[in-house]
Amino acid sequence: MRPLVASVSLLLTLALCACGSPARRADLHAIYDTAAQNIGADRNPVLVIPGVLGTKLESPETMRPVWGSFTYGAADPDTPEGARLVALPMEMGVPLSAIRDEVVPTTVLDTLSVDVGLLRGVELGAYIDILKTLAAGDYRDETLGESGAIDYNGLHYTCFQFPYDWRRDIAEQAGALHDLVLTALAAQPEGAPREKVDIVAHSMGGMVLRYYLRYGPTPLPEDGSLPELDWEGAEFVEHAILVGTPSAGSVLSLEQLVEGVNFASLITPTYQPSVLGSMPAIYQLLPRTRHARVIDGATGQPVDLFDASTWERFGWGLADPNEARTLRHLLPDVPSAEERRAIALDHLGKCLEKAAQLHRAIDLPATPPPGLTMSLVAGDAHPTPDVIAVRPDGSLRVASKAPGDNTVTRTSALMDERVGGPYKPRVRTPAHFETILFLESNHLGLTRDPLFTNFVLYTLLEKPRN
């Protein structure tokens, strides 16, 4: 018993010592001040890609905020007009890429404006933490400069935000991202190499980045095939930093598509399943069937989320008969409930097919070319929904949780292909991350963690070139 008692005593002693010693934080000013002030020709411009919900959406015809502000006058999806603004249109037999509406992305959502009832005038922090990190490295933000928020005295911009319509197909964003990459390179002064950019991408933005690196501006073909994997986008990127990206999906996306969501109870309106179900990108955040993250509660067998008949059988999302009222709001010019349901099921099928196509494109094993460094920042200290069981009536229950950031599991961020199969030593992933940093923060807290700031500044300012 003596060795056991001694071991327990030692552990208690170490624990007490740890409790009595406040954690030290690195003096980032002392570490990076010199590098930040010496803006040489070898510094790459940086692009910031937000995740789902991370871009402000507006209606230019009415000047109304569609997403990014819950002030009075903003689109309210609880009303018929507001629901039509927030949702994407649905048209029978028309490819998703050809379906357009009046809503446009404006800027990255650095803060979220709230002006409702008791919360009048409150601003909720969103992507401001990434911008603060880059500001600490003396990066000059184009959006802040052009808006007049900061006067850079005519100096060239070195930081560029990538606002995009996060409702639409993820692969569709690659073309606009490529245009911004070329804009950022062209903005650099004479004498600069103008060859590479660095990109920091949060959450779903990392999936946009992963697709762009592999396929450049080429969208997914309409016939369901895959484009040539030529790493065209990687030619323009030196450092790709993914933060909390659900590369293998998240069961929470299914929950939202089935049940709808209120993003901040008492603050925001309710987004009904049919409104969210009109958005192809949310389906692209679903977990893979082969990973068995969604199972039949009675048999334990994986549920095929990419088969439209599954959604009809369980009455999920756009296939839910109880969504008839919302569909009437979304499709006011379609006279009958039967026609509206047919259009909704057609849209559902197209979204599921596009999601499966995107997954094949980014899951394909491939080695990145020399000159590209991919890094991952992920959380693994919070119990995160990992497996959902489907009851016979189609309702969902979280069957198990796993380490993550409370939104994205550790294994999803890693794109660990061992999930759902027998144990194998070492992570098996097509993502090829050179560096991985695990933090104890939650999903949005990752970008305000001092270790994140330290890691990003080192990577962008001091890390030796390949």
Residue ranges of predicted features:
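Generic detector of short alpha-helix boundary/capping microenvironments
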Residues: S7-V8, E228, P365
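Positively charged n-region of N-terminal signal peptides that target proteins for export
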Residues: M1-L4
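Secondary-structure capping and boundary motifs in well-ordered enzyme cores
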Residues: V8, A201, A344-H347
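C-terminal subdomain of alpha/beta-hydrolase-fold enzymes, centered on the catalytic histidine
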Residues: G317, N322-N466
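N-terminal non-catalytic accessory region
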Residues: A18-V200, M204-M279, L285, A292-F306, ...
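Bacterial N-terminal signal peptides
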Residues: S7-C17
